[in-house]
């Protein structure tokens, strides 16, 4: 063979194979043919830069190569075998110089071999062979040495096969067992020597490492030149034996050294099929390892240049050798010892070599490794991804299939031993799952840590350094600062603004005009202003809401500092009154601006989910809460300052002789006026404009004539509001805690004392009603609870009033500060409203006007006193407007509106409908109450003190429980404010301290007012009348009216809803409700009562209390006009005031009012309901069963099923007869006490017959007469006339769909809570029809008390059916009403909740 001139040409990049490692092809110079050296494919293009190492290796191999036996064809192949063999192992056919035909052929061979593998897959050996073959064909095609290009791949292959057939591998096997396999003369180097796939397959070449390395093989070639190249790929099977780099290099070296063989032997060896001869039986297929792991050089494909026919020739030989047992890799599986392929090999000539060139240009194939290692260890352990491993393992049915799968699809990657079985794969999956769970756990822990950090981070708004008491989770603060802003998402920024005082925006935002010098030093520490927020934009961007919150917090802090400094100046008396007023107005304006900004920010947060998300962090929420609390406390302090200034003015004014000449209430008026405005015409809420005409000089806050209470309050303001001894942070917290404590204490006391107070009130109301009946005139009638001094003060002439009233007021204030305020405001307001309405501004008038203003203010404040926040809110509104302070009677200070302790929501909430809240509402319904009081004649004014005290006290008392808690939450926090609104605060305090006396006084006041109120009960409907006294009063009235109208509209709607609810409840609770006429009359009466209530401010206070209701139902059966007024006020303020429909026909409209009041009393105070029934009335209405709704507390009067209509002759319909339910008698006595109510026409709900309650219940009139005799006819006649004169009215508490709307009676101003009116369906008490549902007559049941013999109501079957139908219809209507009511309630609630801005609340 012409091996001469064999030279290795470096296949340069000109091969177009990309940045392959240097590829070299051995080009044999033509020996005899003179053929030029040809690289495979493009050998001519190869640069002739032989690789020294490769050449050396090749020479060595060639030196050891013995001359090969050549067939003629082999000679041809030798001649053409001046082939350039790319010794470099390349993974892609691109890198090989083999022409594309080789690639295609190799591919065909691959395909064929795969098919054959499939055919022979039955045998693991065959499988292995197939796998190896395919691997070799696939992988090793790149590694295979190209056939002699001159001969053409097929020719060289055939010749080589021939040679192999001539060649006797056994000899060589004997000579060198490691070369026995090399029958296939494949380069160990990765140029795959083509050997029969059966051999390569047969010997999976686990001992691939044992296969003689190229260096060894070439040396062994002399012994077995054709067998010297057991290819590592042979292990894998296939004719292509991928060789390790070392093997590759060595194999290359051998041909290089043996140039003679290089052209012939080398080319043929590289292309020779292993054991082309039968002797190759020694080449056994040792299926030692099912895992054919490709050599490191993947894709080295021996040029399958043999024709398919030649391969077929060899097949039988391989089959023969297939029987040989494979030997383990440790035995260095002989190449030729494997079984021969039992199927013809594909035409490898069609398969092009795929050579993968290492990317590393400097790469040198490593020295061949020892082949005595297990192939698993020798072959590179290429791990697949867990997914691949699992997929392969699961898809593979067994090791053979796995090997086949891996050999076919993953020739390069080998599944690790531990992952070759499904169990192992499953275990791996479990392991991975566990790891994943661990990672998830760690992630969750990280999230928790982040959350903890977020929660832990706190922003402290205090300028002082962190105090030990203050749990500064945010860490130590280097210096006092108002704001420490952490960006929780990225807590990298913590900025301090030590001198926010330098930020003009803060002052602008706060509206504080005073220079920074005025601010207390604590305020100077950096309060982050919006302008400064950009400095912490990192935070702001992460949590814009947090940035806003911090900005607002800084503003609030600055404003707080200003307020503190202002407070210090005011308390020190350094500021003149005018400056105080101006500064206070400015502070309020700043506070309002801050509130507005806060509300806007809240709205933006609601609208912006991103902000909301940022706000969602507990830290942000805490910031918001703190900010809200701070704003609230600012409002409180401002109110306290206002109160203090008002107190000072009051002290100054009472000191003025002309003011003293005027009713002492003038001093109180300044208080209320101061509450609204420190100086200038102070428009009290609800037209109770504290007009300070020339005659009425607003006392400078510094005036020394403060009442003792005022002084105490002012002192308490100093002490409580800002305990100077404490650092600012602790001071604020202390104040807040004190406020909360006071508020809770007030609420506790009010709740605790409420039963007794109601009990006393009930008793007092009974007495007072009688007294009122006796003393329906001016307030001369002194309620028993009224202190004689107070009564005297009431009776005191105007001249005396100033002093006596003042003294009595002081006493009362000391006793019940609250009482005096209410007395003045409610009593005087109505009378003063009218009296002071006179244009004359004499001192008396001024005093009256002040009294009226106070009365109106206090009347509204009476409830508002309880909830000072409301008056504060109006004052704020007025201050904002810069005009007289108008307060919505129900409106509470922004704190209350915003949902703070005394928030409107609480006021309005069903819970607030409890007597306390309702009372406060009633009193809150300042306009109506004020107007009512305004309608009260001057006689009341003459006794403003007693009246005012009584009415406001009661109102306050009733309103206090909640308002008071609110107030105390706000005002108690700063008693000074309480002092400022001494009547309010004192009233609430007095209520708390002496609820009974309070209630009694209020009852008395309401009674006293009621007599006057009765005189002008209609005045209540026109709240404007009272609210339009003079100038500022008018403006205040206008402002009030604007807000009041809105509020009243809401209240009217709520009242309607409440009426519907009441009607629904009545219809549900009493299957035999009063006839439509009764209901209508009751409704009319209730509306009238509401009107009366509206006219009677004291009603408002009483309204909240059951005793008031009882008072309204005078024992004589005559409802004092005043109680009616009260009820009116209540209804105006709260649905509770709406009279409950009385199930008893007996309950005429007044009775419904009274009973509703009583029921309210029961509602408000179940206890009161129990004892609320007057002993007198108990005997009066025992046939009637009174029960209170579980949720609404509405009192229902139903004839007990036992109760039989007194008039046996009356129709069987029990409703035709007043229902003398065997009540405790209290309700009955109450209704009976009204007497007239019994006399009022009642329409039987069943029969529809309209009878006067007296007619319906002759006997009831008896008991009622007991009480009625006092005023049997007048109120009764009035009520009857009203009922008869006006269309039948439904109980004001409900909308009666069937009945016509109440007559022109002014809409009840019952202020229904924003919360759904009927959160719970009132427990429906279904009484069986008084008469048996069956035709049988119910056996008469004796009345509890001595009653006329009752005749069982007998109803015919038809009547029963009609009754049933009527009841069903009523029930259906009730359900409809209920659903409608719920919808209305929800709608109103939603509107109210979303209309917080309309409520002027700065806090939600």
Curated annotation (Swiss-Prot):
UniProt entry keywords in alphabetical sequence: Activator, Cytoplasm, Cytoskeleton, DNA-binding, Microtubule, Neurogenesis, Nucleus, Phosphoprotein, Transcription, Transcription regulation
Name of protein: Microtubule organization protein AKNA
Function summary: Centrosomal protein that plays a key role in cell delamination by regulating microtubule organization. Required for the delamination and retention of neural stem cells from the subventricular zone during neurogenesis. Also regulates the epithelial-to-mesenchymal transition in other epithelial cells. Acts by increasing centrosomal microtubule nucleation and recruiting nucleation factors and minus-end stabilizers, thereby destabilizing microtubules at the adherens junctions and mediating constriction of the apical endfoot.
Assembly behavior: Interacts with DCTN1. Interacts with MAPRE1/EB1. Interacts with ODF2. Interacts with CAMSAP3.
Positions where Phosphoserine occurs in the chain: 51, 302, 485, 520, 617, 750, 753, 831, 860, 971, 1144-1145, 1200, 1339, 1352, 1389
GO cellular component: centriole; centrosome; cytosol; fibrillar center; microtubule; nucleoplasm
Spans annotated as Disordered: 1-304, 317-382, 494-549, 645-708, 755-1038, 1085-1185, 1208-1235, 1253-1286
Annotated tissue distribution: Expressed in neural stem cells isolated at the peak of subventricular zone (SVZ): localizes at the subdistal appendages of the mother centriole in specific subtypes of neural stem cells and in almost all basal progenitors.
Biased composition (Acidic residues): 70-91, 759-773
Residue ranges with Basic and acidic residues bias: 645-659, 803-813, 1155-1167
Gene: Akna
PTMs per UniProt: Phosphorylated; phosphorylation regulates dissociation from and reassembly at the centrosome.
Ranges annotated as DNA-binding: 1088-1096
Species of the source: Mus musculus
Ranges annotated as biased composition (Polar residues): 185-203, 534-549, 660-674, 686-707, 903-914, 921-933, 963-974, 1085-1098, 1221-1235
Record lineage: Eukaryota, Metazoa, Chordata, Craniata, Vertebrata
Coiled-coil annotated residue ranges, if any: none
Amino acid composition bias (Low complexity), ranges on this chain: 1015-1029
GO molecular function: DNA binding
Region entry PEST, spans: 754-787, 885-906
Compartments in which it is found: Cytoplasm, Cytoskeleton, Microtubule organizing center, Centrosome, Centriole; Nucleus
Major subcellular location class: cytoplasm
Gene null: resulting phenotype: Neonatal lethality: mice fail to thrive and most of them die by postnatal day 10. Mice display systemic inflammation, predominantly in the lungs, accompanied by enhanced leukocyte infiltration and alveolar destruction.
Protein family per UniProt: Belongs to the AKNA family.
GO terms classed as biological process: delamination; epithelial to mesenchymal transition; neuroblast delamination; neuroblast division in subventricular zone; positive regulation of transcription by RNA polymerase II; regulation of inflammatory response
